[in-house]
Structure formats: structure tokens, C-alpha cells
């Protein structure tokens, strides 16, 4: 009997069977980073979890169109550039490169499409024009705002009462708004800020419209799955629905909405505003990235995850045992075969804790097995179970010889990329400082026609 993927759809608050609109080309959109600073480990939970989902969809359907955006125009980016006295592109190029390196270190496969907001200004402007033409948006004092009252279903994702939402918005209401709950699609830019010519004057897009336009451009008006952190459910995802469905004649924007829970640190939500973050960049310099990935998958994605050094240590110890089992099976030839119980666990709303329990069970059986056929079967299943979760893909010798500093290569590569971005922006002081930092660590840089290479002295 074919396996059936079931996912918790936050739109309906139910676990439902998933079937794509087009089985030959399922679509997945995940909200990506705003590249103004290092990503913290809480920011990595979604990419890791939805990396497991993307791999599952590819196995099941043979294809996938997966987009995860880069927000490279935002007031936080502007503030960071002004504070550091550097061009905005220096900030966005640097942190986009670091983000990609950090995700690669965690074993996250790049999405098929990684659209950047600044490369989609014409599409954003066109969508805003469509919303104005259909009376769902209006221009006022160089701004364009979405008229929330024009969309009867506003609030259907977050289940918030529209009157309560509007009441909460009545603090310091901008005079150009017709209604306190109306949100910005386009805003004017002063000469010192990034901006583009538009029918409403020089300006830049609001955050919400960027994702709507990029999703429609690359995946069409209706996508199968939209995913992101639960903190984005309102207002970001609610506003995406309103914009997209009004711009496309009422067509459903996303059929399934998946939201991952937050990471807690010492009992409080991990966030930059609270100052209790641990960056991926720092963590992969101190711990094997695979242990961080394991830790992120250790709780069900919809539940909060309590992050601690103890959790990381537990993940390291577990991986020591699993790689030790594979090392003991070094004399057995086997190719990865994903076991049915692991697929069944992932089919059950991405139940990664159950899948990891199956990994432990298989490893336990493998350690006891004496029969050659059983050992080969169990090694194949252990490799396959790891493959489904993005784990156990190193050689055991590599894990044990470099486990303590497995993230170092990714950290060095990120610094090399950061130096290249600094040179491009003519920030030579920063570029020289990075070169010196690497030299102090015994890393030699070689500028070649193909780019910068590095090696240990």
C-alpha cells in the first residue's frame, strides 16, 4: 500500500492527507532570512526541518519546486549599514554569504530557487498596481497601503478577530491610513536609502508584499505548501494571504501552512531583541554541525524546543554511538535503503523524534547482529534512515577524527566569503583584518583566477 504523507495544516488546524495540485511538480515556499546579521540557531530550525520535508517530497514525487527567499531590502538592513558606515550591499552580501555557508554546514540542501527581493521590484510593483486596480489598495502621501477591510477573510490563518486586530493597531496611527489596520505595500525612500522609481514616486517595498510577489513569480498563484516559523503567522503570513488572494482573483494562495515552533533558551524564546541568542556561526565553530542538526530534529517541529549545551552534548554522544556502529560494520558492503518505519514516521506530520527512535533501534539491532545478511541489511537501513534525516553521511573515520571541529571548514569558508564581499565593497580595512585573523590561525589565502582558495599552513 503506498505511503500517505499527512501534514498539520495550520489553516484548518487539522492533520490532513497531502496531495500536490500537480503530482509531477509539487511546490514549497519557505520564508528565508533578512540578511542584516548572523542567523541564530532558532532561525535554523525551519531550514533544517523543511530540508527533511523537501527531501521527502522529492522521494515521493520525483520532483519539487522549492523556493526560499532572501530579504535584502529592509529597515533593519538600512540601520545596520548606517551604524557601520558601509554600503547596504556590504551588509547584504556579507550576511547572505554567511547564511548560505551556515546552512550548508548544517547539511541543508540549497533550495531550487533563492529569489532576492531587490531582483523582483518590477513584479512587486505590478502586484501592487493590480491591488490598487481591484480596490484592495490605495496610494497616500507616497505610500501604498493594503485596505484590510476589503478582504473579508482577513484573519483566517491566525484566527484573530478583525476588530481586535484593528483595536490593537490604533496606537500612533499614521495620518495617511484610512484604517488603523491597513499595512504598507510601498513606502517612500529618502535619498540616503535604497529606492526604486514607481508610479507612486521613489520608494521601496514593504516586507509582506516581497514574499507574495516572489512566490507568485516562481511558483504560481497557488502553492502547495507555505512554511515558516510560528512567529511569522501574524502579521506576515496573514498579510501574504490577503495580498496574494486579492491580487489573483480569490485564488487560494497556499493550500497547506506549516509552522515550526520556537527555540527556548533558559525558559525564554530565543530572539535578537531579548539578547539571548546563540548564532549558528558561533555554534558551528564550537560543535560538530551534524550534532546541531540532530538536536534541531530531536523534538517535533511544531513543539517548542529547549536549547542548551546539554542538548548538544546529548546529540554528540548519540552520533558517537551511531557512527561507532557504522565503524563496526566497516567490513560490510551496503547501500542506503530507507526503512519503512522511518518513512512512516516522517509521513506522520514529520515526526522526527519517532524517526530518530527508529534510527536508534536499527543501530541497536546492528550491534547485536552476527549473521552476515542481517548485518548488511541493518547497515543499509541505518544509512538509509540517516539519509532521510540528513544524518550519518560522513565516513565514521571523518566523524571521529574531526568531530570536535567539524564546523571549522565552514567557518573558515564563511570568513573567506566575507573577505571577498568586503573587498568588493572596497572595505579594505575589514578585508585585511579577516586575512590577518586567518593568518593567525595558520590559514593561507591564495587569490586565483577562479576565486580565493585557502589551505592550512
Swiss-Prot record:
Which annotated residues bind Zn(2+)? 31, 211, 236, 240
GO BP terms? cysteinyl-tRNA aminoacylation
Give the binding site residues for ATP: 272
Q: Spell out the InterPro entries in the cross-references.
A: Cys-tRNA-ligase (IPR015803), Cys-tRNA-synt_Ia_DALR (IPR015273), Cys-tRNA/MSH_ligase (IPR024909), Rossmann-like_a/b/a_fold (IPR014729), tRNA-synt_1_cat_dom (IPR032678), tRNAsynth_Ia_anticodon-bd (IPR009080)
Q: Name one GO cellular component term.
A: cytoplasm
Q: Where would I look for the motif 'KMSKS' region in this sequence?
A: 269-273
Could you identify this protein by its name?
A: Cysteine--tRNA ligase
Tell where it localizes.
Cytoplasm
Cofactor(s) the record lists: Zn(2+)
Q: What is the protein's quaternary organization?
A: Monomer.
Q: Which Pfam families match?
A: DALR_2, tRNA-synt_1e
Q: Which CDD domains match?
A: CysRS_core
One GO MF annotation is: ATP binding
Q: What class of enzyme is it?
A: ligase
E.C. designation(s): 6.1.1.16
Is Cell division among this UniProt entry's keywords?
no
Q: Where is this motif: 'HIGH' region?
A: 33-43
Reaction catalysed by this chain? tRNA(Cys) + L-cysteine + ATP = L-cysteinyl-tRNA(Cys) + AMP + diphosphate
